[in-house]
Structures are given as structure tokens and as C-alpha cells.
């Protein structure tokens, strides 16, 4: 796996996409807009602050005004959910980029840049107020490469693994959510991490989704498991992988029960399939 500062999961409600997701036609394409900003040669392109943009099968949250066109996105490992990105102008994309995706502090290699250039590449938290309903993510997220438009192996493995994970998670007493996240604006919500502290398996929520290409088709099936920062084990202890994203490769349906038991419930990495990982401080994990 390559290092990244943030993975942006665009909620498309679809299971597959064109080989290059930025080339998708037939409607709105938030991934293309973000790649225009953060891709090679983009306005905010920074080799020391990689933003990985992926499409996902998760559905977007219904907007407050049903006639408005909107998109949703997950930010990981920040564990933020952006429910409403109005798609009537580029303003919401800029707010997402400037308020959440740009680095808070630039790499020392940028010290030679002009003050104006450094300022343009640095996060401005004031932009966060332009995006409504942003929440901390308290759900376990299981992401499976199902990008058949890029590689047929992923198109075969993805749906099979999704079904198997949903089955085994339910048997482990997690509630598997398939519907869109519903956000009611104006409600007083405590979205701090401490508010979501819960033992995984004790009625906790898990979401299993297909995602676009993450590299390494030879490792199909590719799976990334994100454990929310406030997660605890059933024994009430801090989950050893809380706030982390764990990457696995060559996962087959027969391996899923073990991954649920060891990684999601037990906080242990399965070495045989481990491709890498990332923690909440963006440090790469290895064994």
C-alpha cells in the first residue's frame, strides 16, 4: 500500500465504475472534481500529502431539500462523514478541500515556497462551517475492492466478500447497516469520539461497501478495515486497532470469519494476509 494523508470515499450508491473513475459519464462526478484539485498537477497537489480519492457503493444521505442534488463522502482515517455536498456549484468541493483535506502544517520541503503559495496549500478551518451536518464516524467500515471495470478479478471477489462479511458480522452480533446515513439538521448531536464509545459486537454498527481501485490487483480480494477511534473490546478494554485502517490482500470468503473474529472483534492483525495499515496520526503500520 502507498502512504496517504486521507482517503476520500465518495458515496455513489453503485457497485462498479469506469476503469478511471474520473472518466465516469452520465451525471455528477465528485471524484473527478477532487482529482482535479489533488491529482497530479492539480491546484493542491502535494507529494508529501497524498489524498486518495475512491468511489464507494455506500449511498449518499438524502439532502434536506429533496429537489437539491447532493453527494456524501467519508474521510479516513479522520473518521469524518460529510453528508451534504451540494452539487450546484464548485463551492462545496472547495470547502471540503480547504476545510478538511489540505494539511494543517506543510512539510519542511515547502519552506522555500512564497508565503502566498504556502498559505494556499494550508488548511483553513473556517471553511468547515460551510458544510452542514458533519459527523464523527462511529461505524466499523469494511471496504472491499469490487472495481470490475478496472479488473475482472475484483469484480468477482468484491460482491462475494461483501455478502460473506455481512453474514459473519451479523452472526457476531454487529448490526449491519445497508441504508444511507440519515442526518437531521438542527438536532443537537454529540459527535465527539467519546460519545460513541461502544464495545464492538455489542450492537455496534458495521457497514460493508465496495470501493474502486486501491492498487495491487494481484492481491485480490483486497479489503480495508477501519476501526472507529473510540472502539472497545467486549471486555471493555480499548480496542488495539482503534483509529486504524488495516489492509488485507488475497482474502477469500473462507477467510472472512477469521478476520471478523481476529481483527474486528479482537484487535489483532492476521499476518498472512496483511498488506499494511495506517493509524490516526497517518503513520504506516507494519509487522
For each feature predicted by the language model, list its residue ranges.
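Histidine/cysteine-enriched polar flanking segments
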Residues: 1-287
Amino acid at each position: 500500500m502507498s502512504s496517504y494523508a486521507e482517503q476520500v470515499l465518495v458515496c455513489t450508491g453503485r457497485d462498479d465504475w469506469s476503469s478511471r473513475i474520473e472518466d465516469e459519464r452520465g451525471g455528477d462526478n465528485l471524484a473527478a472534481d477532487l482529482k482535479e484539485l489533488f491529482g497530479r498537477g492539480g491546484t493542491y497537489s502535494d507529494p508529501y500529502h497524498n489524498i486518495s480519492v475512491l468511489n464507494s457503493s455506500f449511498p449518499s444521505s438524502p439532502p434536506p431539500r429533496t429537489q437539491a442534488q447532493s453527494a456524501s463522502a467519508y474521510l479516513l482515517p479522520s473518521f469524518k462523514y460529510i453528508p451534504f455536498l451540494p452539487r450546484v456549484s464548485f463551492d462545496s468541493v472547495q470547502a471540503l478541500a480547504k476545510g478538511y483535506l489540505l494539511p494543517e502544517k506543510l512539510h519542511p520541503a515547502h519552506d522555500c515556497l512564497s508565503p502566498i503559495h504556502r498559505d494556499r496549500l494550508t488548511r483553513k478551518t473556517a471553511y468547515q462551517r460551510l458544510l452542514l451536518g458533519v459527523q464523527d464516524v462511529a461505524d466499523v467500515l469494511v471496504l472491499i475492492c469490487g472495481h470490475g471495470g478496472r479488473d475482472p478479478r475484483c469484480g468477482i471477489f468484491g460482491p462475494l466478500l461483501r455478502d460473506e462479511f455481512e453474514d459473519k458480522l451479523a452472526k457476531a452480533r454487529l448490526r449491519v447497516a445497508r441504508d444511507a446515513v440519515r442526518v437531521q439538521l438542527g438536532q443537537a448531536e454529540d459527535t465527539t469520539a467519546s460519545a460513541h464509545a461502544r464495545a464492538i459486537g455489542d450492537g455496534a454498527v458495521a457497514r460493508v461497501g465496495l470501493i474502486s481501485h486501491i492498487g495491487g490487483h494481484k492481491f485480490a480480494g483486497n479489503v480495508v478495515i477501519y476501526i472507529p477511534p473510540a472502539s472497545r473490546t467486549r471486555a471493555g478494554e480499548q480496542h488495539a486497532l482503534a483509529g486504524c485502517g488495516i489492509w488485507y490482500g488475497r482474502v477469500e470468503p473462507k477467510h472472512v470469519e477469521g478476520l471478523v473474529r481476529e481483527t474486528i472483534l479482537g484487535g489483532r492483525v492476521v499476518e498472512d494476509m496483511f498488506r499494511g495499515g495506517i493509524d490516526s496520526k497517518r503513520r504506516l503500520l507494519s509487522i
